[in-house]
């Protein structure tokens, strides 16, 4: 079924391009709605566009057992990131219905909108919306490269951005589970089929705009230049060095956006905008690196006669998975009979926003060579099926009233 979803992706030679709220994203979302309907789920769409499919339990008054992931992509992305989680959950529900499996708690399968930060620079927006963590001001503030705000994107899809501050998911939730490709090389290297996630790292993201003088490249001597790009280059290397110095717990730092103005060969760069992502499983370690990076930016700018501004766009919190959920997943893996390991997640996921309020667990499957956010992203079908089998056992048990998460 992931191949079927791939057919509606805006797929080009360079990969999957299904950025949030684009036509390609909306076509993929409709595919998920169709698959949920085919599986016998009742569909609910919230004001942010999140798709929620329900399989009713015998006791609908009980808190729902939630499972989900996302189906939007980064620019030029792969065919498995997020998709494995949503389609696996739907197939588990289909299996339950085929088996006539009866359970107490209603199960909610969610396709979260705008999990990727590729369009608006801020990740997991759909789950943030469901958790009541967004404001109308946020929707106006987040703008894509074409100058379209998230508010406008929602309006363009006939959604209700003005209701964002009162759209927090109202039903009580017993648990949240997400299955995902690892997006790293650890499982493959350790020859393990399943990873049981113990915690999720989270990023602090900010834009740094460095300003110098856009002078003539031929008429300005080297000793009289204020080259914003040279300063930015020094800052990029400084971020790499500072993050590398923090060994335990580790911190990673990435500059994934570089915009140079005016961008002409005969003009010294007058301004450079950098998009910086610094993340760790430890908030204290991450905050320490962010502080050092900002101090380094200040020193570099002063030495080179440059000015700068910093705009923080995200400060997500690292979270731990619930011990009871880790135990439930471990029990399911053992019953399936495959090799597994416990591990942290370096990448952020929708699960991190539910972990703050309900027992949450994550299941990883390997991806080839650890490649993700890339057209070469690939997961073996046997691993996907094994992961779905584990998820099936977890959800069947969680959906029983007698299963207590303590």
Label for each model-derived stretch:
Residues 1-9:
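Single conserved hydrophobic/aromatic residue that forms the stacking wall/gate
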Residues 7, 68-69, 340-390:
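Zn-dependent metallopeptidase/amidohydrolase metal-coordination segment
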Residues 14-56:
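A non-catalytic alpha/beta surface segment that caps or lines the substrate-entry region
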Residues 19-21, 254-263, 275-282, 307-326, ...:
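A short beta-alpha structural unit
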Residues 39, 51-84, 216:
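Catalytic-core environment of secreted peptidases
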Residues 67, 76-116, 204-210, 216, ...:
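Alpha-helical metal-binding/catalytic segments enriched in His/Glu/Asp
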Residues 114-115, 121-283:
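Midchain, well-structured core segments that form catalytic/ion-binding scaffolds
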Residues 198-200, 216, 220-245, 285, ...:
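His/Asp/Glu-rich mid-to-C-terminal helical/loop segments that flank catalytic regions of hydrolases
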């Amino acid at each position: 079924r992931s191949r079927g979803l791939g057919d509606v992706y805006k797929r080009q030679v360079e990969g999957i391009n299904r950025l949030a709220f684009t036509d390609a994203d909306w076509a993929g979302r409709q595919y998920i709605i169709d698959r949920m309907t085919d599986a016998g789920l009742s569909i609910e769409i919230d004001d942010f566009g999140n798709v929620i499919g329900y399989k009713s339990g015998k006791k609908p008054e009980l808190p729902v057992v939630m499972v989900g992931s996302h189906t939007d992509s980064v620019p030029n992305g792969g065919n498995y990131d997020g998709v494995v989680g949503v389609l696996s959950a739907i197939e588990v529900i289909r299996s339950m219905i085929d088996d006539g499996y009866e359970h107490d708690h209603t199960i909610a399968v969610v396709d979260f909108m705008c999990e990727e930060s590729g369009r608006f620079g801020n990740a997991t927006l759909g789950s943030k919306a469901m958790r009541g963590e967004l404001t109308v001001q946020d929707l106006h503030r987040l703008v894509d490269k074409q100058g379209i705000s998230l508010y406008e994107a929602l309006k363009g899809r006939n959604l209700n951005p003005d209701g964002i501050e009162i759209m927090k998911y109202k039903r009580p939730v017993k648990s949240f589970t997400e299955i995902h490709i690892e997006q790293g090389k650890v499982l493959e290297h350790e020859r393990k089929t399943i990873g049981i996630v113990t915690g999720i790292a989270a990023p602090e993201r900010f834009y740094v705009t460095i300003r110098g003088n856009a002078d003539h490249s031929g008429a300005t001597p080297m000793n009289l230049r204020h080259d914003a790009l040279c300063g930015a280059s020094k800052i990029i290397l400084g971020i790499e060095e500072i993050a590398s110095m923090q060994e335990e717990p580790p911190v990673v730092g990435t500059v994934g956006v570089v915009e140079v103005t005016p961008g002409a060969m005969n003009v010294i760069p007058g301004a450079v905008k950098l998009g910086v992502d610094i993340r760790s499983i430890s908030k204290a370690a991450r905050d320490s690196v962010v502080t050092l990076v900002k101090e380094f930016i200040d020193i570099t700018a002063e030495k080179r006669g440059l000015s700068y501004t910093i705009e923080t766009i995200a400060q997500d919190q690292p979270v731990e998975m619930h011990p009871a959920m880790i135990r439930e997943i471990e029990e399911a893996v053992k019953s399936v009979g495959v090799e597994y390991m416990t591990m942290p997640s370096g990448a952020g996921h929708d699960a991190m926003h539910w972990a703050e309020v309900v027992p949450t667990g994550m299941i990883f499957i390997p991806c080839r060579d650890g490649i993700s956010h890339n057209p070469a992203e690939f997961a073996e079908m046997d691993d996907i099926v094994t992961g779905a089998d584990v998820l099936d056992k977890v959800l069947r048990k969680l959906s029983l009233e007698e299963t207590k998460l303590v």
